[in-house]
């Protein structure tokens, strides 16, 4: 394990070793995503002049801005306590870390991709071929399950151009929408796995109370993204019918109105179901139905 004292003290005042060290990506889309999640979870901080460190206001958490692919290794070695990174990078690094939660964003597939006009049907057919990838470890392990071995060309980016440049016969790369593959006249031959953005922690469980509090806050943000708050008025005689449509987690919140024959209902509904729910409520006599965004919640 890397001693915690190897990192320079952050800020001033409190002992930095009593602060949880959270590694987040220093740049790129994942950096923006991580920063947004932390802000939504109520973590206020200021990164000055693209510095490497920032202290969270009001919580014993220090942020360390790192290369995304270094976060799994640094977490496993104890240089940081927790980190936000991609599950693909954890697997590639072979890092011994605990996944505390998945954020449900940054989802992608790691796949073998070949030219459209090649008739490969199985990754085993790439035995002895040249494969360009940013994931040599994962690629080699997967090929071994196929009793195959290839010449791996390790790159840090622009993998999809390597076949046209004559560097490789196939590539292993992350695929989201597939538009980049289509633009380069490539197709997916075989998928290796599915990955997403996750929060990880090492086995020391240092600053456990702070870590658990951070997880709770982030879980509230992630859960809120899946739900909306629906409010409506309903005749009291139809409340039982309405509850079947909008049962909520435990039960809906029901408030009295000036008209004693009516009541107001508040309930959380999955965002993908809101439109249908509103239509069904209207059919049984509900009125004043509207949807509100939830930014954070605890259940």
Swiss-Prot record:
InterPro entries: ATP-PRT_HisG_long, ATP_PRibTrfase_cat, ATP_PRibTrfase_CS, ATP_PRibTrfase_HisG, HisG_C, N-reg_PII-like_a/b, N-reg_PII/ATP_PRibTrfase_C. It catalyses: 1-(5-phospho-beta-D-ribosyl)-ATP + diphosphate = 5-phospho-alpha-D-ribose 1-diphosphate + ATP. One of its GO terms (biological process) is L-histidine biosynthetic process. It comes from the Bacteria. PROSITE patterns: ATP_P_PHORIBOSYLTR (PS01316). Belongs to the ATP phosphoribosyltransferase family. Long subfamily. Keywords: Amino-acid biosynthesis, ATP-binding, Cytoplasm, Glycosyltransferase, Histidine biosynthesis, Magnesium, Metal-binding, Nucleotide-binding, Transferase. Pathway: Amino-acid biosynthesis; L-histidine biosynthesis; L-histidine from 5-phospho-alpha-D-ribose 1-diphosphate: step 1/9. The keyword Nucleotide-binding applies. It is found in: Cytoplasm. NCBIfam families: hisG (TIGR00070), HisG_C-term (TIGR03455). Its EC number is 2.4.2.17. Catalyzes the condensation of ATP and 5-phosphoribose 1-diphosphate to form N'-(5'-phosphoribosyl)-ATP (PR-ATP). Has a crucial role in the pathway because the rate of histidine biosynthesis seems to be controlled primarily by regulation of HisG enzymatic activity. Gene3D superfamilies: 3.30.70.120, Periplasmic binding protein-like II. This is ATP phosphoribosyltransferase. The lineage of its organism: Bacteria, Pseudomonadati, Planctomycetota, Planctomycetia, Pirellulales. The keyword Cytoplasm applies. GO terms for molecular function: ATP binding; ATP phosphoribosyltransferase activity; magnesium ion binding. PANTHER family: ATP PHOSPHORIBOSYLTRANSFERASE (PTHR21403:SF8), ATP PHOSPHORIBOSYLTRANSFERASE ATP-PRTASE (PTHR21403). One of its GO terms (cellular component) is cytoplasm. It is an enzyme of class 2 (transferase). Its cofactor is Mg(2+).
